[in-house]
Amino acid sequence: MSIGSMIRWLLAWAAALVVVWSFFEVGMRLWREHDPSDHRTRLVIMQWGDASEEQIVEGLKNQYEKEHPDIKIERIHANDFDPKLKTMMAAGTPPDLFYLNSDDLADFATEHLITNLDPLIADMPDGQKWLDGYYPVLLNAFRFDGHAAGSGHLYGIPKDFTTMLMYVNCDLFKQAGIAIPYGGWTWDEFFDDCKKISKLPADAAGRDYGAVFNAWPGMIQCLMRCYGGDLFNGSDFTHITIDTPAGIKALSVIQQARFVDESIYHSTGPQSGSYGEQLFYTGKVAILGPVGRWQTPHFRGVGQNDEGITSFHWDVVPLPHEQKAAVNIATVAWTMSADTKHPKEAMQLLRFLAGARGQEVVARGGMAIPSLRAVAESPAFLSGKPAHSQIFLDEVKDSYNPVFPSDPEFSQYMTDDISECLDLNQESPKQVAQDLSTDWAHEMASPLKTKQYPPMRWMPIVAATGLMIAVAVASVWLVSRRQKLGALDKKMERVGWLFVSPWVIGFIGLTLGPMVLSLLLSMTRWTAMTPMTTAQFVGADNYKEMATYDFQEHIKPALLVTGYYAALSVPLGQLAALAVAMLMNSRARGITMFRTIYYIPTLVGGVTMAAIWLWLLNPTYGLINHILGPIASKMGTAPPDWIGSDADRWAVPAMVMMSMWTVGGGMLTYLAALKNVPFSLYEAARIDGASATRQFFTVTIPMISPLIFFNLIMAIIGSFQVFAQVFVMTGGGPKNATLFYVIYLYRQAFQFHNMGYASALAWVLFLLVLALTGIVIRGSKSWVYYEGLKA
């Protein structure tokens, strides 16, 4: 046996052993988790958080196992917490206990995914006394009455929280001659102070800003409450009341400060918040807020690579008020799955995890406020910077938990609509308020929200599928029996089926099966947070919804954005790849190194590439605008804010520009095709007097036209499936400037939990791409030349 053959055999055996070991390891893992000799009660807990929070929960877990030898705890930490949790729930294997944000309570409680803790607490001898140790507003944040949070049954025990307030640069306040408002201030005073500070003389590092103001939906609601209004009239969330004097006032004062006074730092796009925080960190912003306690460790310098703020004196002040004080809070609780098999044991563990031990550690770290009064009011929380930490606790008396509809679509609607006013400055507050009211009214009137549907009948479908598979297998067996084959032919046929079986099984199980299932799901209403047995049959209503209001509001804009991107990226990408391949096809010295350099970017993952381009496209310190700045200034203009305030014009071209970074993949295939063009054809063309340009169009293009055709189809398909970069960089915003079709599909499936509607969107995308591919294939007959099919 030759060395080459030996290496191939070794690689084949190694691959086979890896596959076998993988299955064995998974099986052993399941066996270890369910070891029949281990009679301890097994509880699974799930959390998010940084390394310090992981360490806290791991320490609590070990301590509890030590004190309760009959309990075995498995801790799961997930950065992609929501997708993993919802996948586990849909699979019917949720963790017993897990973190739950107060914003998600209504969503989980409506779907009956979490346990009502009231009966379990009632069984405790000191249950009510234990609850009395927590701030009531926090407990109310995890009560749900079937319609809204704030009252009703208790579904979670808060582990920590934060009130929203303002971090201030005391030195800038002193320079502007403004007293630091420790005792409280109004919103009018806040905006006046911002104007005064923004007029301070600029230094070498640039001008100073009055504030970085976080105008998320919860903050708009808080501002409306201060002005005597609220987002909704009543707790049924059917009638939004932003189109009122309080709502218009809340939007107007922010728009005025950002775009007229320019006293508040404003930058749209995904890095606007982090860059604003960095400006505060470096002393160029006087007020950062409204934010919570989570900024404290960073400003203290607690992190491994954090130096903390040492160049100026910083502190915290209360949130401004107006007609009345209103302070929103953010809180997270330990909650119990509705499917836990050990509710009593899980409840005892929940009480321990939400107890004083862990909260004292969190308090000393400064990340959050303990939810237990005794710990929050102790030196563990109040000592250290900021000097006025007591303000966090004083704000509790005026605090409330932001209550939004259980439909996650509302937050997206509100974010998109107010973005046109507060981020893009394209619409007036009055118009934005009317748009949001109209959008929400249509959402509430949708048959998919109001109509009652029957359950999806899965058993007949499963039975029919099983019958079809049985008929197919029986047909193949009967045909093979009727064929009069010799022993050798039968053996060859069996070997053939053996070799093709991995593909057949994979195609049926991983491609055809999911396609059929998604087609069935497109006729259902299903959240994907519960087993598929809970799906409801809606018939063609998903498709009707797509063809009516949703088409104008979301689908049409998404198709226009995607089509615009495809129209630019497909031809430019193919031309760039072919041009680079022509250059790399030369015999110049060192050309191999250049081929490698051009190809390497294609190996970079989509998320990493998006992170790189976020920095490149940053309007303030990005490399691209740094290069374009001098050129633009000579033309009397400025470089665009690519994915920020100028996103409606420049976001898609920016995405196309980013796609050019990966032309190395196409270059490689074109280079291989160019190497296969017979040199004799070029010699014959030169003898006939053809110029280099004529040789390119009459020899090169026809000979590589099959590959051009293939790459064209793949590029069209790829351009309609752009996701990772856009999701990381913009999430589809601002407004709908980067709302690619697949981004909208993702929103429906995993943010709004409308998996049935998302499946319908996926089938429309499939048919659209299929139609475009068919058009290209039909048109290829006139320009694609196949050497093997020549006459």
Question: Which ranges hold each PLM region?
Answer:
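Long, aromatic- and glycine/proline-rich binding clefts that accommodate carbohydrate-like moieties
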Residues: 314-317, 364-416, 420
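Conserved C-terminal helix/tail region of periplasmic/extracytoplasmic solute-binding proteins
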Residues: 3, 8-12, 16, 29, ...
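A structural signal for multi-pass alpha-helical bundles of membrane permease subunits
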Residues: 495-791
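Extracytoplasmic/periplasmic solute-binding protein
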Residues: 144-159, 164, 174, 189-239, ...
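Glycine-centered hinge/linker elements that transmit conformational signals in sensory
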Residues: 193-194, 236-269, 319
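Extracytoplasmic/periplasmic substrate-recognition and gating elements
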Residues: 72, 90, 148, 176, ...
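Short, solvent-exposed loop/beta-turn-alpha elements that line the ligand-binding surface or hinge
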Residues: 118-134, 183, 201, 229-249, ...
